[in-house]
Amino acid sequence: YGLVGSEMCIRDSVEGARQAADNGDLLMGTIDTWLIWKLTDGKRHVTDYTNASRTLLFNIHTMQWDSDLLELFTIPETMMPELLPCDAVFGETTVGGLFKNPIVIAGVLGDSHGALAGQMCFEEGLGKVTYGTGSSVMVNIGEKAAVAPRGLFTSIGFAALGKIFYAFEG
């Protein structure tokens, strides 16, 4: 969680990074952004709403990068990946020429969010519990964001079929 700290550390400690950011020559993103960037040979700089919601820079109500937060942390919006719903087409890959015909990259979700969809929690009130390296409880709260009860936070559950599904998570 929280891409901001890593980005600030890079800009402050890597020689030339701050200038590259100011010039529009430095990009940032989440793990899906990097994977898609590599798979598309640098053609696509994108992320989905669920991964973006983990950056501390994404507004879950507008589905956009939060300009106030970007300004607060002095992050140029040009560094940020394009935002897409989970069921969008994110690009194409031949996996470095391994395949003759391109394979479409269609569908991206963050891990807990993917588990919510994978457990078919498509209706309000359905949830999942995941235990692994970390643990996560996530419950679909429907298409309207709500203030989470104490100890939980409101997040994007997933975005598909033109709809945004919110979730409580803890």
Residue ranges: model-predicted function:
Residues Y1, L26-M28, K128:
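A residue-level structural signature of the nucleotidyltransferase/glycosyltransferase Rossmann-like core
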Residues Y1-G5, C9:
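Single conserved hydrophobic/aromatic residue that forms the stacking wall/gate
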Residues V4, V108-G110, Y166:
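Hydrophobic transmembrane-helix microenvironments that flank and shape a buried ionizable site
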Residues D12-Q19, D25, G29, T33, ...:
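Glycine/Thr-rich phosphate-binding loops that ligate phosphate moieties of nucleotide
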Residues D41-N51:
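Enzymes and membrane/adaptor proteins characterized by extended Gly/Ser/Thr/Asp/Glu-rich
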Residues T50-L161:
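ATP-dependent carbohydrate kinase catalytic cores
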